[in-house]
Regions:
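Metal-coordinating catalytic core of metallo-dependent amide/deamination hydrolases
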Residues: 1-111
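General structural feature for long, well-ordered alpha-helical segments within catalytic domains
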Residues: 21-24, 38, 51-58, 93, ...
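Divalent metal-coordination and catalytic microenvironments
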Residues: 42, 72, 110, 124, ...
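Glycine-rich phosphate/pyrophosphate-binding beta-alpha loops
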Residues: 45-46, 133-141, 161-169
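Glycine-enriched alpha-helix->loop->beta-strand junction motifs that scaffold or abut catalytic
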Residues: 59-68, 102-106, 123-132, 153-158
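Catalytic core of soluble alpha/beta enzymes
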Residues: 75-107, 112-126, 139-150, 168-174
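His/Asp/Glu-enriched, well-ordered alpha-helical/loop segment
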Residues: 92, 99-105, 149-237
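C-terminal cap of metal-dependent C-N hydrolases
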Residues: 225-273
Length: 273
């Protein structure tokens, strides 16, 4: 759970003073400190909407309450340049968060990461940060396509998200399919630099890699929480499909009507969704 911070370059009705933003954030952190069900995280909207005093203040709160950070990173070329304009003396977008101490006390989660520089990638890898691919959102805002294959090959952690503000649905399974589709487009336009990812690659990033943000979730391995969906794949009795083909079918054409049961930490959820 997070509380978004922004004290500049934002609509007036969303802009806080630096002092109020830090005060309300600390109040929220203190309220949930020690909770077994709620994990807190800091959420500066992104560097262009946060002053240096705000970013530095959030870094101090991260140290005090031992929490991580969730924000956007190099979502667009404009964002990357604007961040450096507002933070002179910094060499990359990621360095803004690193120097503030926001990447030292918990998971650091960065949405989009479409135009990472070598310095951005070095910092992300150093801190074991998660770059979150949000396929639908990047299309909707005409941002670009994450270089997932390259980042994966360089050992960066890649999770997957829906970006409920920039996206248009909360089903992560559809993002799995969309990630494959976008990788095909990237290969088409950059055949010498990019290659298509497989459905199993995308599924791994959406499940085990994403789940590792929270601990041992996202896998059916021993010792992991049993979080699962029971899916009616509507398989034709005369059609033999592999497990991978069944997964692919659901990700591309399935929806919530195919989900017959949901388990969280081994418990069957009884309520309807």
């Amino acid at each position: 759970r997070d509380r978004v911070n922004m004290d500049c370059n934002s609509p007036e009705f969303l802009t806080e003073t630096t002092e109020d933003s830090l005060k309300e954030t600390e109040k929220y952190l203190a309220e949930h400190e020690g909770s077994k069900k709620v994990k807190t995280i800091l959420a500066p909207r992104f560097a262009p909407t946060c002053s240096k005093p705000l970013i530095d203040g959030l870094g101090k709160l991260a140290a005090k309450y031992h929490c991580g950070v969730h924000t956007h990173l190099v979502e667009s070329l404009w964002e990357a340049q604007e961040a450096l304009n507002l933070f002179p003396g910094y060499s990359s977008d990621a360095e803004i968060y690193e120097r503030a101490g926001l990447m030292d006390h918990g998971p650091s989660i960065f949405a989009h990461v479409i135009f990472p520089t070598e310095e951005d990638k070095r910092i992300l890898k150093k801190h074991g940060s998660f770059s979150v691919h949000c396929p639908d959102a990047t299309v909707n805002i005409i941002a670009g396509i994450m270089p997932l294959q390259h980042m994966e090959a360089e050992g960066l952690k890649i999770a997957m998200g829906t970006d409920i503000a920039g996206g248009h649905g909360i089903g992560i399974y559809r993002q799995v399919a969309r990630a494959v589709q976008l990788s095909k487009l990237k290969e088409f336009y950059e055949p010498q630099e990019s290659k298509t990812i497989t459905i199993t690659q995308a599924f791994y990033h959406a499940t085990k890699e994403s789940g590792s943000v929270f601990g041992k979730v996202g896998s059916f391995e021993k010792g992991y929480a049993f979080n699962a969906l029971v899916i009616d794949n509507m398989e034709d009795p005369w059609t033999k499909m592999t497990a991978e083909e069944k997964l692919e079918r659901f990700c591309y054409i399935g929806d919530d009507r195919n989900i017959k049961a949901r388990y969280i930490d081994g418990e069957l959820l009884e309520q309807e969704f």
